[in-house]
Each structure stands twice: as structure tokens, then as C-alpha cells.
From Swiss-Prot:
The lineage of its organism: Bacteria, Pseudomonadati, Pseudomonadota, Alphaproteobacteria, Hyphomicrobiales. Its EC number is 2.4.2.17. NCBIfam families: hisG (TIGR00070). The gene is hisG. This is ATP phosphoribosyltransferase. Catalyzes the condensation of ATP and 5-phosphoribose 1-diphosphate to form N'-(5'-phosphoribosyl)-ATP (PR-ATP). Has a crucial role in the pathway because the rate of histidine biosynthesis seems to be controlled primarily by regulation of HisG enzymatic activity. One of its GO terms (cellular component) is cytoplasm.
Length: 325
């Protein structure tokens, strides 16, 4: 039997809950045979798939080493922990949860420091006055170095943070920080604020593929099935299915509906009996229903879609293109 296809997912907390819910909505149920404490699982209906439950940072490491084919982790951890990330992994799809911004934050008392250019001036003056470099507390050493280098800032030193980074300036262990934030409330509570141009990265949980994994034909087929489910669910979220029947419908009317409401006719124009099926963005449903009735439709029904499978799978095409590079 060939080596298993490995999908690495978060092992605890909200990230695990959101990840399992995401795959469940796509028709891919993750399960643990040994119960909640088990760190290995399966996907119902997919043979030879091993679900590895790991910390988000461990997932990035496994992807980097080719020990997982696909993994769910934050882009911040990918960029921080994987050198030349764009060559070694591919961010296949943002998953819409796990949002966090990696930012440069300074004490609110620094009223004259609004930008990275201001910070550059302050770091130079700080070194001249105190005969030491300004300290930046962070867990994101590589992202910080790259961002500061891009802004020409050199008079600083990094203090690697083991605990709550936002408390470092108040504790006297650093002058400023680079950290993640979602609302900014924790930064504000610790007397910090984000520089106007201090956004290093807007991160979210991503489905990430590893170049160095064993992409056998069987592994590629497993990835195709998984990504087909995810793409079908994503398409379904974009539309509602609209059904109606009226003989007055023609190509010109469909063209107008497409241009005005963004609808698609996935099965072509109306049948000989006038039956018509359209896919419509949710925000345009009432406008479309009114338009159809104005042109002769007696009844217009709307149903939600679970999946919309197309011949083309953009997610798998993205993976294949990445592996060919």
C-alpha cells in the first residue's frame, strides 16, 4: 500500500473548530477513531488519507519538510517559518477565518512617531543618546527583519518574545513590538498603537500545499477530490438557484438579466416548455425575481445550493501549476 496522503489541521481551539466546520461544509467529514485525544484522524469516504492534528506552527514545519501534502495554517506562520515560502509551498485558498494582522506597534506616548520613517529617525537618535540599539520584542523574527530592511531601518535589535509580547514595553524589556492583532483592543489596553504604515501582513488561515511532499498519481487524485469538494462549496456560496417558467424568455432577455444582475444560466436557455434555471448572486435575488415577473413569469422560486461542481477546478489547477514550476 502506498504512503498515506497527509492533511495537517490545527489540533485545538477555535482554529480546529473552524477547520473541521469548513471541511464538513464541503462534504468532507474529519473524524478521530480514538476520540478527542487522538492526534490522527481520517476523512469519511476517502481511503488512504491521514489527518494529522498538530499546532499551527508545527503544520508550517511539516509542510516545509514535505511531511504533509496539504495543511491548514496561518499565512503569518508560513511567511515567518518557511524560507522562500513562495517556492516551497502554495497558498491554495484563504479559508475565511483565523484573521490576524502582523503589525508594528509603538507606545501611544510617542506622539511624533506615526510612520516607519519616523521610527527610523527615532532609532538613530535612541542609539546616539543611550549607546544601545532600540529593542523590538516579537515572535516574528524573520518578518520583522524583512519589513524593517525594506524601510531602511538598521538601528534596532530583536528581543525574542516568549510570552505576551504586548506587555514588553511596559515591563521595560523592549521599546516597541511586532505582534499579531485582530481588533487592536489588546494593544490599546497596553498603551500601544499601530504605526500608520506599520501593517506587515494581513493574515488568515489558508489551505497550503507542500512542493516537497510525495505527489504520486494517487496523492494528486486525492488532492483533486478534496479540492473539488472545496471549490464546489465555494461556488454554491456565491449563488442561489432561481427557477421559473415562461415562454416569453429569449436570448436577449437572458443577456439583459446577466448584465444587470450577474446571473448565469448553467444549463442553457429555457426548455421547450419555458422552464428556466438561473444562478443568481444572493444580493440580486429580489431584483431578478421582479424583473422576471415583469416579463411574464408567473412564479419564481429560490433555493439554496449545497455544491456546484464544474468541469474546471481552479483550486486543483492552481496546485498542478505550482507543482509543475
Amino acid at each position: 500500500m502506498s504512503a498515506p496522503f497527509v492533511l495537517a489541521v490545527p489540533s485545538k481551539g477555535r482554529l480546529q473548530e473552524n477547520t473541521e466546520a469548513f471541511f464538513a461544509r464541503a462534504g468532507l467529514k474529519l473524524s478521530k477513531a480514538g476520540g478527542a485525544r487522538d492526534y490522527r484522524g481520517t476523512i469519511a469516504g476517502l481511503d488512504n488519507v491521514e489527518v494529522a492534528y498538530l499546532s499551527a506552527s508545527e503544520i508550517a514545519a511539516q509542510l516545509s519538510r514535505g511531511l504533509a501534502h496539504l495543511g491548514v495554517t496561518g499565512e503569518d506562520l508560513v511567511r515567518e517559518n518557511i524560507a522562500d515560502a513562495d517556492k516551497r509551498v502554495s497558498l491554495i485558498e484563504g479559508l475565511g477565518f483565523g484573521y490576524a494582522d502582523v503589525v508594528v506597534a509603538v507606545p501611544q506616548a510617542w506622539i511624533d512617531v506615526r510612520t516607519m520613517a519616523d521610527l527610523d529617525d527615532v532609532t538613530t537618535g535612541f542609539r546616539e543618546q543611550h549607546h544601545m540599539r532600540m529593542r523590538v520584542a516579537t515572535k516574528f523574527v524573520n518578518l520583522t527583519r524583512a519589513f524593517f530592511q525594506n524601510h531602511g531601518i538598521t538601528d534596532y535589535r530583536i528581543v525574542e518574545s516568549a510570552g505576551a509580547t504586548e506587555g514588553a514595553p511596559a515591563a521595560g524589556s523592549a521599546e516597541l513590538i511586532v505582534d499579531i492583532t485582530t481588533t487592536g483592543a489588546t494593544l490599546a489596553a497596553n498603551g500601544l498603537r499601530v504605526l500608520d504604515d506599520g501593517m506587515i501582513l494581513r493574515s488568515q488561515a489558508n489551505l497550503v500545499a507542500s512542493r516537497d511532499a510525495d505527489w504520486s498519481p494517487q496523492a494528486r487524485e486525492t488532492a483533486r477530490v478534496i479540492l473539488d469538494h472545496i471549490a464546489a462549496r465555494a461556488r454554491a456560496n456565491k449563488y442561489r438557484e432561481v427557477r421559473t417558467r415562461f415562454r416569453q424568455c429569449d436570448a436577449a432577455l437572458l443577456g439583459e438579466a446577466h448584465s444587470r444582475f450577474g446571473v448565469e444560466a448553467p444549463f442553457g436557455g429555457p426548455t421547450s416548455s419555458g422552464m428556466l434555471t438561473l444562478h443568481c448572486p444572493p444580493g440580486q435575488l429580489y431584483a431578478l425575481a421582479s424583473f422576471l415577473r415583469e416579463h411574464g413569469a408567473e412564479t419564481v422560486s429560490v433555493v439554496s445550493l449545497d455544491y456546484v461542481f464544474d468541469r474546471e477546478n481552479p483550486l486543483f489547477a492552481k496546485l498542478e501549476a505550482f507543482l509543475r514550476r
